[in-house]
């Protein structure tokens, strides 16, 4: 099958880019795949982080950077390129309505000229910080799409609220296997200057909905109930970090809560996950998260909150714990994990469970949905 994938690839950084690159590589094993990348993903004035790029990741010379998200001329150029290729299938990933005008216009140009099947892999349909025009933009894009893949029940519900007759398949987010194998825990902790025997990790972009404040509050509970532990929270901050620093100072937990406001490059991800005992996602809202598949790849258990689809891929007491988005409950779940280490083999449970999240299965679903 001849396939075109449109979206975010390296040198752009982050989970979306990682997903696209992995999808491209996996599909290329058995199909003729062309990828089209952004020349401009976000204007700098609209990007809240320090940089859009990961300098440690090289862009694939076979992937053309054509699409400028705010330049309609580039949308036409991308559509023209795809029309010339005459693919059987075009694939997009959708995570925010900002890209709906460019993606929708590309599909409109294409549909006027050739018959082509189209598929959207849905991360988010209704964004975390929604605005009144989001549904209008999403509908504009989605009306040109034939098939959808949703990776959580909450996204499934959002899709059906906009398009009750949508043709879709639900399947969980596949594992990220692009970060390499885990490394020795003691060595990784030495590199990170972590001396405590217990390490709890919060990883990824820091945004209001991700509940870092809940984890700080949970740490204030843990300091009286857990011994010899460190909480490491690392990620680029998409908001003012001062309130978090103030909370840490107020609770006098500077010695046990290590807040590092920095992006972790691709080649350093395994260092942090290898060092950790457990990964915590104290989110206040969510659809699904790419952090859980990364944790599972490194056979690390998780504590997640029961928002969106986070709890759908956690086997309670076997691969992790599901908590309400409440600081005391999050703290209790962390305590329960450490209390059960001699009773539960979390690592082996996760290894078995990971068979449900293979990329082979995900690719098979893409093939199945478009040949119906």
What are these regions (language model features)?
Residues 66, 244-267:
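Nucleotide-activated donor-binding/catalytic signature segment of Leloir-type glycosyltransferases, i.e.
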Residues 143-182:
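Donor nucleotide-sugar binding/catalytic pocket of nucleotide-sugar-dependent glycosyltransferases
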Residues 281, 295, 301-304, 314:
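Short hydrophobic beta-strand element within catalytic cores of glycosyltransferases
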Residues 316-328, 336-341:
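Conserved acidic donor-binding segment of nucleotide-sugar-dependent glycosyltransferases
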């Amino acid at each position: 099958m001849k396939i075109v994938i449109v979206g975010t690839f390296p040198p752009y950084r982050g989970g979306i880019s990682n997903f696209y690159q992995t999808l491209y590589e996996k599909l290329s094993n058995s199909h003729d795949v062309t990828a089209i990348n952004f020349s401009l993903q976000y204007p700098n004035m609209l990007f809240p982080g320090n940089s859009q790029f990961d300098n440690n990741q090289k862009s694939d010379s076979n992937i053309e950077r054509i699409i400028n998200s705010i330049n309609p001329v580039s949308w036409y150029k991308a559509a023209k390129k795809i029309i010339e290729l005459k693919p059987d299938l075009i694939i997009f990933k959708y995570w925010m309505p900002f890209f709906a005008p460019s993606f929708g216009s590309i599909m409109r140009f294409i549909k006027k000229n050739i018959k082509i099947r189209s598929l959207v892999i849905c991360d988010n349909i209704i964004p975390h910080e929604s605005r009144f025009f989001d549904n209008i933009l999403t509908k504009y894009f989605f009306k040109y799409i034939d098939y959808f893949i949703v990776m959580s029940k909450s996204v499934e519900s959002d899709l059906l609220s906009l398009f009750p007759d949508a043709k879709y398949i639900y399947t969980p987010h596949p594992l990220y296997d692009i970060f390499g194998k885990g490394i020795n825990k003691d060595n990784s902790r030495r590199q990170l200057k972590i001396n405590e025997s217990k390490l709890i990790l919060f990883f990824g972009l820091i945004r209001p909905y991700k509940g870092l404040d809940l984890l700080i509050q949970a740490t204030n509970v843990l300091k009286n109930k857990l011994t010899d532990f460190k909480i490491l929270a690392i990620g680029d901050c998409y908001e003012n970090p001062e309130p978090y620093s103030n909370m840490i100072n107020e609770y006098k937990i500077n010695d046990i809560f290590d807040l590092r406001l920095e992006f972790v490059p691709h080649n350093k991800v395994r260092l942090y996950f290898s060092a950790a005992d457990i990964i915590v996602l104290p989110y206040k809202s969510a659809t699904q998260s790419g952090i859980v598949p990364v944790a599972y790849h490194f056979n690390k258990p998780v504590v997640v909150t029961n928002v969106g689809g986070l709890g759908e891929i956690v086997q309670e007491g076997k691969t992790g714990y599901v908590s309400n988005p409440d600081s005391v409950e999050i703290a209790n779940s962390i305590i329960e994990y450490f209390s059960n280490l001699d009773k539960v083999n979390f690592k082996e449970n996760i290894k078995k469970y990971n068979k449900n999240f293979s990329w082979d299965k995900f690719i098979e679903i893409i093939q199945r949905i478009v040949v119906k």
